[in-house]
C-alpha cells in the first residue's frame, strides 16, 4: 500500500471519529451558528434620504408593530424601543 493511501485512510478515520464525538445525545449535530438571535430593536435611518442613524426602530422578525423613536426627541429612545416592541 502506498503512503498516500495510508494518509488518506488516516484522514477518513480521524474525520469519522470527530463526527462521532460532535454528536449530541439526541443524534443531532450541535451547530452554534443556528442559535443567532436578532434583537427586536435596530438603530437605523429616520428618513430615507438622510445618512445619519438617529432612530431606534422595532424591526424584529417577530415584532407585531413597526415603531420608531427618534434619539433627538427622546434621549432614552433605545430603552423605549426595547420596552415598546411587542414580541409574539
Swiss-Prot record:
Tissue: Expressed in leaves and flowers.
Pfam families in the record: ESF1 (PF18209)
Keywords, ordered alphabetically: Disulfide bond, Signal
InterPro entries reported in the protein's UniProt record: ESF1_brassicaceae (IPR041608)
N-terminal signal peptide: 1-22
A biological-process GO annotation: suspensor development
Disulfide cross-links: 41-57, 46-85, 55-81, 58-68
Statement: the UniProt record of this protein carries the keyword Disulfide bond: yes
Keyword Transit peptide listed: no
Annotated transmembrane regions: none
Protein family: Belongs to the MEG family.
Protein's name according to its UniProt entry: EMBRYO SURROUNDING FACTOR 1-like protein 7
Organism of provenance: Arabidopsis thaliana (Mouse-ear cress)
Amino acid at each position: 500500500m502506498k503512503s498516500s493511501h495510508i494518509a488518506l485512510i488516516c484522514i477518513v478515520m480521524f474525520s469519522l471519529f470527530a463526527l462521532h464525538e460532535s454528536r449530541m445525545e439526541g443524534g443531532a449535530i450541535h451547530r452554534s451558528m443556528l442559535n443567532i438571535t436578532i434583537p427586536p430593536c435596530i438603530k437605523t435611518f429616520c428618513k430615507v434620504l438622510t445618512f445619519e442613524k438617529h432612530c431606534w426602530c422595532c424591526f424584529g422578525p417577530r415584532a407585531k408593530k413597526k415603531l420608531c423613536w427618534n434619539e433627538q426627541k427622546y434621549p432614552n429612545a433605545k430603552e423605549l424601543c426595547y420596552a415598546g416592541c411587542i414580541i409574539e
